[in-house]
């Protein structure tokens, strides 16, 4: 009977609660359920396990409201880079507006921009904190600790007003805490020591840009909860040295993941971790003062290593990678970025010893050439992802071997590889027909021939990016449209592509959700008309620097693509204020429009000011 609830009254709360637990976890799904009726609203509040909020617009009051309404929360994520999205008001209006991505850090006059911080007490910053009323404070953390005593995950990203006092309240009240992210927080040693003393189940700790910490805090934490710690990240903490890592090596014997980015860490610290943490599986290092000696120890003791990432090392040689290849037989992922002294011998050693390798990235290692990658192609049949960035010495024959030997390859990324051309891409397309993702940028020897072969052979391709590839034209996109069902396409700067290529994509890729056609001088309204007809799921489009597109084509596109969420259209001379108004008024889901400020009418600005972004011209 219409208007009469036949089933809701007989469903017990426990059953509805169980149904809510089966949802996808998205906030939109939870909110939709809570709007059914008051009973479902109350039950949904009981079922909510995760909240994500920004830390601007009086976050302390916002946290207090959350604690009152969602009593069973286990995971809290607070990020000061994000604005609070709340319909509630706390004695004043919350108006959307521009927010600073990262707040200005407190520094001494001579401090280095990212690695050093002033040595000031937390009390001396009280007056300064009063000038920032829209940041999460210790009072907010105290409320959080009192309300969410069963908290398991807490992320505080760039909450610069939080101090040791607030962190101590969390530690004392939330003994079940397992994950703690303090990125960009100016907490001190006392707070970290309290976490070590009280949170004996802590497994994951992130200390990126925690400039107020010293060895004292991390040593105390390691002694307190080192037995449970499995993941540790340290970056730009100028006062954390080898002393801390020695404590980690001594007390954190179950550590599996370690990420270090510091010029103050030397061999001694990494050696201690390698010897003490034999269960290490993930190691990421950006430490310019670490040498072969440290990696030789990793190769000796860390036999379970699965992921190794080395960034900007000037002191590593082939000896290090040979040691890794000889011992770390389980290695599945390897990233080498700006390691200038590594040569083909390193990749040959990895290929010989690490046959399970699935992911390889070589970025700016100028002494690594063709023979090293050939060895990978011959010996690592399980390779699924390959990225070659700024590898001028790697030629076609290397990808010939990858095409022959790595049939499971699903993702290939090529950036500024001047010696790789169409023949190499053809070999990959014919040999790796499971390819799903292909990104190519500024590889000027790659043109229509290679991309046509991809369209003919790689039927599972969904993500294609061809940025500033001068030799790629309409014929390539016609083949892609006929052979692949893309979801993501970026052809920015491919000036030979025009309407014909995009029309083929529109007719052959109905599931397209992202499109970047910026800097295509030959693209006109006909392509936009076809995109509107053929790609109804399109959410994001970049049209900047397309000088033939007009308001007419734009109007037809937005009329048909009702799911559009973002549109970039700067430097399009034939798009006027009328076109901008059409986008804003026609797309109910639009979240961002990037355009020149002078093209926005007063009416459009009043109607949709919060979603408009302007090109910065006044430099």
For each feature predicted by the language model, list its residue ranges.
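N-terminal adaptor-interaction module of cullin-RING ubiquitin ligase components
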Residues: 1-184, 188-222, 226-234, 238-241, ...
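C-terminal capping region of solenoid repeat domains
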Residues: 85-87, 94-130, 216, 224-225, ...
């Amino acid at each position: 009977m219409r208007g009469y609830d036949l089933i809701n009254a007989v469903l017990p709360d426990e059953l509805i609660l169980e149904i809510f637990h089966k949802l996808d976890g998205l906030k939109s799904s939870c909110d939709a359920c809570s709007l059914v009726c008051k009973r479902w609203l109350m039950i949904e509040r009981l079922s909510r396990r995760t909240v994500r909020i920004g830390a601007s617009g009086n976050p302390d009051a916002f946290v207090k409201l959350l604690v009152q309404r969602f009593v069973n929360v286990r995971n809290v994520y607070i990020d000061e880079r994000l604005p609070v999205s709340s319909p509630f008001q706390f004695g004043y209006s919350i108006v959307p507006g521009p927010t600073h991505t990262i707040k200005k850090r407190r520094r001494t006059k001579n401090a280095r921009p990212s690695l050093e911080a002033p040595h000031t007490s937390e009390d001396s910053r009280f007056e300064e904190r009063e000038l920032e009323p829209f940041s999460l404070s210790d009072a907010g953390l105290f409320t959080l600790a009192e309300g969410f005593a069963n908290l398991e995950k807490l992320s505080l990203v760039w909450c610069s007003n939080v101090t040791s006092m607030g962190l101590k309240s969390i530690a004392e009240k939330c003994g079940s805490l397992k994950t703690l992210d303090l990125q960009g927080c100016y907490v001190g040693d006392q707070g970290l020591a309290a976490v070590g003393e009280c949170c004996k189940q802590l497994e994951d700790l992130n200390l990126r840009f925690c400039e107020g910490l010293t060895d004292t805090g991390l040593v105390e934490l390691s002694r307190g909860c080192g037995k449970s710690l499995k993941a540790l990240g340290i970056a730009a903490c100028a006062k954390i040295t080898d002393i801390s890592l020695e404590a980690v090596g001594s007390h954190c014997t179950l550590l599996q993941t370690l990420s270090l980015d510091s010029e103050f860490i030397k061999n001694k610290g990494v050696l201690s971790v390698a010897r003490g943490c034999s269960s290490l599986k993930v190691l990421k290092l950006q430490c310019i003062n670490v040498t072969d000696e440290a990696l030789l120890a990793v190769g000796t003791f860390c036999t379970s290593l699965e992921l190794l990432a080395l960034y900007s090392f000037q002191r590593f040689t082939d000896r290090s990678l040979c040691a890794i290849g000889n011992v770390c037989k389980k290695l599945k992922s390897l990233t080498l970025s700006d390691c200038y002294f590594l040569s083909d011998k390193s990749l040959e050693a990895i290929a010989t010893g690490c046959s399970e390798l699935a992911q390889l990235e070589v970025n700016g290692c100028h002494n690594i050439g063709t023979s090293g990658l050939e060895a990978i192609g011959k010996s690592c049949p399980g390779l699924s992802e390959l990225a070659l960035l700024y590898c001028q010495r790697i030629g076609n024959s290397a990808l010939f071997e990858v095409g022959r030997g790595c049939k499971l390859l699903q993702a290939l990324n090529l950036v500024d590889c001047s010696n790789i051309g169409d023949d190499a891409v053809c070999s990959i397309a014919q040999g790796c027909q499971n390819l799903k993702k292909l990104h190519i940028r500024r590889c000027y020897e790659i043109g229509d021939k290679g991309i046509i072969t991809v369209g003919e052979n790689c039927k599972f391709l969904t993500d294609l990016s061809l940025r500033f590839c001068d030799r790629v034209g309409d014929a390539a996109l016609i083949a892609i449209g006929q052979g692949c069902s893309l979801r993501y396409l970026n052809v920015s700067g491919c000036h030979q592509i025009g309407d014909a290529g995009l029309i083929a994509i529109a007719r052959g890729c109905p599931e397209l959700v992202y499109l970047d056609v910026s800097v295509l001088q030959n693209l006109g309204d006909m392509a936009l008309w076809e995109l509107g007809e053929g790609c109804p799921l399109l959410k994001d489009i970049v049209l900047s620097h397309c000088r033939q597109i007009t308001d007419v084509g734009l109007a037809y596109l937005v009329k048909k693509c009702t799911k559009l969420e973002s549109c970039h259209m700067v430097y399009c001379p034939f798009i006027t204020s009328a076109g901008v108004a059409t986008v804003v008024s026609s797309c109910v889901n639009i979240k961002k429009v990037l355009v020149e400020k002078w093209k926005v009418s007063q009416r459009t600005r009043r109607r949709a000011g919060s979603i408009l972004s302007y090109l910065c011209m006044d430099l």
